[in-house]
């Protein structure tokens, strides 16, 4: 058993639908511990910095515009094989391809407004967590 941390964003469209609690319930039902979480409204600079790897791609400006269109909830999840299990719970990036019962199948509106973000590797998780959280803001749970 390998306990990992992964990073999650509940995106503006899901926040607007008032499904934060439903998504958090799904995290906990899947065995994740939420060890850090906060709601914030991303500035253009924060969104551009977070998604810097996509700069220059055709969807970049629309992604930044969407991610700054309303509040988001950023979270740190902890659990066994957390990165892959969280990705499985989210479903395919394109909700049209997401399996029934995944977060994106249930809450996404489109390819861009796909309800959630999750780290794609342990390395990305560490970078993304550090982008939004100081170590003192993460509370490891032992029970």
UniProtKB/Swiss-Prot annotation:
GO cellular component: cytoplasm
Positions bound to ATP: 11, 59, 87, 93, 104, 114
GO molecular function terms listed in the Swiss-Prot or TrEMBL record: ATP binding; metal ion binding; nucleoside diphosphate kinase activity
Source domain of life: Bacteria
Keywords: ATP-binding, Cytoplasm, Kinase, Magnesium, Metal-binding, Nucleotide metabolism, Nucleotide-binding, Phosphoprotein, Transferase
InterPro entries, A to Z: NDK-like_dom, NDK-like_dom_sf, Nucleoside_diP_kinase
Enzyme class name: transferase
Pfam families found in the cross-reference section: NDK
Enzyme Commission number(s): 2.7.4.6
GO biological process: CTP biosynthetic process; GTP biosynthetic process; UTP biosynthetic process
Subcellular locations according to the entry: Cytoplasm
Cofactor(s) recorded in Swiss-Prot or TrEMBL: Mg(2+)
Disulphide-bridged cysteine pairs: none
KW Cytoplasm (keyword) present: yes
Catalyses which reaction(s): a 2'-deoxyribonucleoside 5'-diphosphate + ATP = a 2'-deoxyribonucleoside 5'-triphosphate + ADP; a ribonucleoside 5'-diphosphate + ATP = a ribonucleoside 5'-triphosphate + ADP
Job of this protein: Major role in the synthesis of nucleoside triphosphates other than ATP. The ATP gamma phosphate is transferred to the NDP beta phosphate via a ping-pong mechanism, using a phosphorylated active-site intermediate.
Subunit structure: Homotetramer.
Family: Belongs to the NDK family.
Alphabetical list of HAMAP family matching this protein: NDP_kinase
NCBIfam families linked: PRK00668.1
Protein name: Nucleoside diphosphate kinase
Species whose genome carries this gene: Erwinia tasmaniensis (strain DSM 17950 / CFBP 7177 / CIP 109463 / NCPPB 4357 / Et1/99)
Gene name linked to the record: ndk
């Amino acid at each position: 058993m390998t306990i990992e941390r992964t990073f999650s964003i509940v995106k503006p469209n899901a926040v607007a639908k008032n499904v934060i609690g439903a998504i958090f319930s799904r995290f906990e039902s899947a065995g994740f511990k939420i060890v850090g979480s906060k709601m914030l409204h991303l500035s253009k600079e924060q969104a551009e910095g977070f998604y810097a790897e996509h700069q220059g791609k055709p969807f970049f400006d629309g992604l930044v515009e969407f991610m700054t269109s309303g509040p988001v909830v950023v979270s740190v999840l902890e659990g066994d094989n957390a990165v892959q299990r969280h990705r499985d719970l989210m479903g395919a990036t394109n909700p049209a391809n997401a399996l029934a019962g995944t977060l994106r199948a249930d809450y996404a509106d489109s390819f861009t407004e796909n309800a959630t973000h999750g780290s794609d590797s342990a390395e990305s998780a560490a970078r993304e967590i550090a982008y939004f959280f100081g170590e003192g803001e993460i509370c490891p749970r032992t029970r």
